[in-house]
Every structure is written in structure tokens, then in C-alpha cells.
């Protein structure tokens, strides 16, 4: 697969002296096509650059993997990994299986937990570089792609945490590469492979299905519609549906709880933005200086008869997320592919302007490095606060509650040791008999998962919660006494006759809504907790 200029339509190859003419005359009028001369993945300079870039990316993420603490969702997924199932209230099953595999292979230390997301980040950079190379890009296009992807704030953030978001861009880019190749050079075997990738990707996040549908719609509206409306598409859909079916069946059996989570989050939690702001926020999401790259990639795709469908798919995806009031970063996994196409266009457009090439890559790298401490744990907390003040940057409001001193992705990694210590002090007030059958009731899954994971060192009772999957795990029996953290007093008084306030959980760096939480010891239940449990359900 290579990108050629308009001269290629007349049979003139873009090599040697003709390459200079092609770059100057028609670099933006690109057709992407596969032929016998497509570059192989031999150890050429571009391919060596790909593997070097992947290793550097992995090393970068591993260097900062233990600076703060376990993130809220990581702790939750550890709990899910100990209760493997075909589905969960708020996510498909793959992430729990991946976390379980990570725990078995590497252990449960913070550094060990961050190995797989670092590898995923390196894999994304490598696949982006290889995609640029297969489009006909040389070492420069490959390098620009890898730098742009590796230092994009979104990719830096998701690559530093073991959540499903670490793998989502890799699934999306893999689908882009496969469909790109299928449009150029149809092969029967690719359709089942596409279905396999979409199906497994949907077990990671349902958004994979949304991207696949956007691609199908985009291709159907493009001149290349005949390349997708073939029997192979039905085969791909059948494979994808078969793989995703167990999770769909689990959701159906439990009353579609994930839809309740999405609906409640839209009504009660998510920060809604206008369509204009949604579009504007795409620029800083992937590094402001990368915006010309992915915009150039979109323009190049629109001019391509074969691949205009990819640009149309992007438009469909953006419109859909705006209509559904999705978060601004929900379309971010599509950008690595667009950056690769834009990097090839940049390489051809600047063939005779080496100074512009050097300046562009230096500017993208410098901007990415400057933003990096705000996206991934690269600085100790005091230094981070000073860096934010120096840049006059405040934490971005991602949900409809007050922001804290640090960005939410960092706040959710802090305060867990203090929470566990607070719970331990409250449990110490229980009698030996009470402690033998006690539980710790929390207001959300992050608190419950933190106590379950970190509480082992103090032999704390199990955590229970009505939040998301913890609700389905139930009250874990009847309890003579309950330590309640972050649960409204009005809720507790409906269930318990004796309620004693014994402390308060505070942490300077967590979100304000998660600090200054009263701690109660509750005794003398009015009814068995199993009967009251349904009143604690909180799908959000």
C-alpha cells in the first residue's frame, strides 16, 4: 500500500527524480492503493524507526508508572477480576480478564499493574508508524506519526492506566488498517479477521461497534461503496456478533444495567457541552500542534475516491457523539489513523523544504512534552502544582461537580491510603464480636474497591456498596455492625436504629465531592440488609 501523486494515474512512478515532481505538483491529491511494489516489513530505516519508537514509548510510560497511586477504575477492575463474568453493570468483560491476567503474570504492585497499558501504548505507536509506512511514508512520515501519537495528551493519559481505554485506540486503529487494506486489495480472509477484531473490541468497549457502524455508513456514502457491500461484510458482522453475544446476553439477563448507567450519567454526572465546544476541544485533546496533521489527513482522505469513506465515518462519529451528548474524548481513538495519513501528506508536501520538516517535528514534540505532565504522572505533586501555576492552567471540568487542585485523572489516583486508614480506625472501635461479622459500606465503587484491595494489610472486613457492579455482588451476608463511609445519613437512618459518627475522611488532592466524608458505625438494623439492599442501588 502506498500513497502516490496524481502522476501515478498516468503510470509514472513516484521514485527518483519523479518523486520530487510528484511531491510538488500533487501531494494533496492522494490515492492510496496496494500494488506489488508495496513495502514489506523488512528491517528498513522506517521499520527500525517504528520499533525504536515503540520501545521508547513503553519506556516512557514505565518510567512514571508508580509516581502517584492506583486509579479508581484500576482498583475496581481488580475487584472485577476476582469475580470474572461475561459482563458487568458498567463495562464488558474483557478488561476484568486482562487485569486478572496481569495480576497472575506480574503481581499486584502499582508498577506491575501498569506494564500492560505501557505495552499497549507502545503497540499503538508502532501500529501508527507501520500504517504510515504502508501508506508509502518514509522515515520522516513514520517519525512524525509516532511522535504525534506518543505525545498526544489523550494517548499519554490512557496509556498510563490499566483500564479499557488503554486498549481502545489500538482496536480502532487495527480496524482502520484492516478496512483500509481491504478497500485497496480485497482478500476473503480479511472479513473474518475484521469481524474478530470488532467482536473482541466490543468486549473491551461497546464504542468499537459504534466505530464499525460509522465506517460501514461512511463507506456506503462514498464512491467505494461497492468494496464493502459484499457477502464478506455479512460474514464479518456474524463473527463480531457471535463474539459479543455472551456479553449482550448477560446484559439482557440483568435488565440492561449498562444502559441505566449511561442514562443516569447523562442526567446526573456528565458535563454537557455545545457542538461548537465539542469540536474545539478536539484540538487540545491530541496536542494543538497535531491538529494540522489530522485535519490534513481528513482532507487527503476526502480527495481519495477509495478512502473518502474514512473521512465521512469521522463526521458521522462526531455528529453521533454530539447528538448523544458524549464526552469530548469519545472520538479520540480515531485520531492516530488520521495523524498517520496527515504525516504522509506532510512528508510529500515538504519534500523540498527540509527546514519546514525539521520545524514541524520539533514543534509537535516540544508541545507534547510541555503538555505531558498534565496528562500523565510525570511530576511529583508539589512540582505539578507549581507547573500548573506557571502555565496558569487549571484542572479541566470533565463532570458536573467542582474540580480539585489537580486534574481528575490524577485526583482519582490519590487519597486511597488515607481512606483505608480512616476505615481501619473506625473498624478498631468495633467489639471483637461485631468485627467478626462486620462490613464497610461505601458510597461508590472506587472506595469499596480501595478498601477491599488495600484493607488486606489491616485485615479489614469486606467492602460492600450499592454502586454499579458492587450492587450485584450484594450485601455479602448479614452484619452485626456496619462502618459507613460516604453514604448519606438519611439513607442510613432508614435502615439502622443506632448510628454513631466516629470520624471523617479527608484528602487534599481528591475531588471535593470525595473528601470531607463522614464515617459512621451503624448498629441495630431495622430489617435484614438483604431486604433493604435494593434501596442502595446506584447505577451511575
Question: What do these predicted regions represent?
Answer:
Residues 83, 146, 178, 190-205, ...:
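Membrane-interface alpha helices of multi-pass inner-membrane proteins
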Residues 127, 148, 167-185, 190-198, ...:
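Specific aromatic-rich, kink-prone transmembrane helix
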Amino acid at each position: 500500500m502506498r500513497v502516490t501523486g496524481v502522476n501515478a494515474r498516468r503510470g509514472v512512478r513516484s521514485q527518483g527524480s519523479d518523486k520530487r515532481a510528484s511531491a510538488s505538483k500533487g501531494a494533496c491529491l492522494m490515492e492510496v492503493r496496494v500494488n506489488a511494489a508495496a513495502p514489506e516489513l523488512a528491517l528498513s530505516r522506517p521499520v527500525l524507526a517504528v520499533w525504536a519508537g515503540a520501545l521508547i514509548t513503553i519506556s516512557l510510560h514505565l518510567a512514571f508508572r508508580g509516581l502517584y497511586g492506583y486509579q479508581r477504575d484500576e482498583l475496581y477492575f481488580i475487584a472485577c477480576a476476582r469475580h470474572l463474568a461475561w459482563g458487568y453493570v458498567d463495562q464488558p468483560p474483557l478488561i476484568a480478564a486482562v487485569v486478572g491476567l496481569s495480576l497472575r503474570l506480574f503481581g499486584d504492585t502499582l508498577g506491575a499493574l501498569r506494564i500492560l497499558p505501557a505495552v499497549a501504548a507502545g503497540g499503538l505507536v508502532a501500529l501508527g508508524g507501520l500504517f504510515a509506512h504502508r501508506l508509502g511514508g518514509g522515515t520522516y512520515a513514520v517519525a512524525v506519526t509516532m511522535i504525534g501519537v506518543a505525545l498526544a495528551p489523550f494517548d499519554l493519559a490512557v496509556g498510563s492506566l490499566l483500564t479499557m481505554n488503554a486498549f481502545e485506540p489500538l482496536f480502532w486503529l487495527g480496524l482502520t488498517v484492516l478496512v483500509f487494506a481491504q478497500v485497496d486489495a480485497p482478500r476473503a480472509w480479511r472479513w473474518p479477521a475484521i469481524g474478530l477484531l470488532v467482536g473482541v473490541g466490543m468486549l473491551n468497549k461497546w464504542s468499537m461497534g459504534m466505530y464499525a457502524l460509522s465506517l460501514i455508513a461512511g463507506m456506503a456514502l462514498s464512491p467505494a461503496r461497492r468494496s464493502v457491500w459484499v457477502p464478506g461484510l455479512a460474514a464479518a458482522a456474524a463473527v463480531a456478533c457471535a463474539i459479543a453475544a455472551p456479553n449482550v446476553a448477560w446484559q439482557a439477563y440483568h435488565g440492561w444495567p449498562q444502559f441505566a448507567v449511561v442514562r443516569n450519567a447523562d442526567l446526573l454526572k456528565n458535563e454537557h457541552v455545545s457542538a461548537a465546544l465539542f469540536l474545539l476541544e478536539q484540538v487540545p485533546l491530541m496536542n494543538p500542534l497535531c491538529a494540522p496533521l489530522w485535519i490534513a489527513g481528513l482532507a487527503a482522505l476526502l480527495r481519495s475516491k477509495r478512502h473518502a469513506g474514512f473521512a465521512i465515518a469521522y463526521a458521522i462519529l462526531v455528529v453521533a457523539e454530539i447528538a448523544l451528548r458524549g464526552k469530548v474524548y469519545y472520538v479520540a481513538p480515531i485520531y492516530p489513523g488520521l495523524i498517520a495519513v496527515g504525516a504522509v501528506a506532510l512528508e510529500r508536501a515538504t519534500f523540498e523544504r527540509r527546514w519546514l520538516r525539521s520545524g514541524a517535528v520539533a514543534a509537535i514534540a516540544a508541545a507534547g512534552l510541555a503538555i505531558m505532565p498534565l496528562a500523565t504522572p510525570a511530576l511529583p505533586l508539589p512540582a505539578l502544582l507549581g507547573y500548573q501555576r506557571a502555565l496558569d492552567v487549571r484542572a479541566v471540568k470533565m463532570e458536573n461537580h467542582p474540580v480539585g487542585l489537580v486534574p481528575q485523572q490524577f485526583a482519582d489516583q490519590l487519597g486511597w491510603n488515607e481512606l483505608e486508614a480512616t476505615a481501619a480506625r473506625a473498624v478498631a472501635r468495633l467489639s471483637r464480636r461485631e468485627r467478626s461479622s462486620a462490613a464497610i459500606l461505601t458510597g461508590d465503587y472506587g472506595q469499596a474497591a480501595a478498601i477491599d484491595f488495600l484493607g488486606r494489610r489491616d485485615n479489614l472486613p469486606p467492602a460492600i456498596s450499592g454502586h454499579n457492579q458492587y450492587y450485584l455482588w450484594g450485601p455479602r451476608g448479614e452484619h452485626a455492625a456496619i462502618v459507613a463511609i460516604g453514604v448519606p445519613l438519611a439513607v442510613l437512618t432508614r435502615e439502622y436504629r443506632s448510628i454513631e459518627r466516629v470520624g471523617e475522611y479527608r484528602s487534599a488532592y481528591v475531588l471535593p465531592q470525595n473528601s470531607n466524608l463522614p464515617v459512621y458505625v451503624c448498629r441495630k438494623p431495622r430489617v435484614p440488609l438483604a431486604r433493604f439492599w435494593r434501596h442502595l442501588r446506584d447505577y451511575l
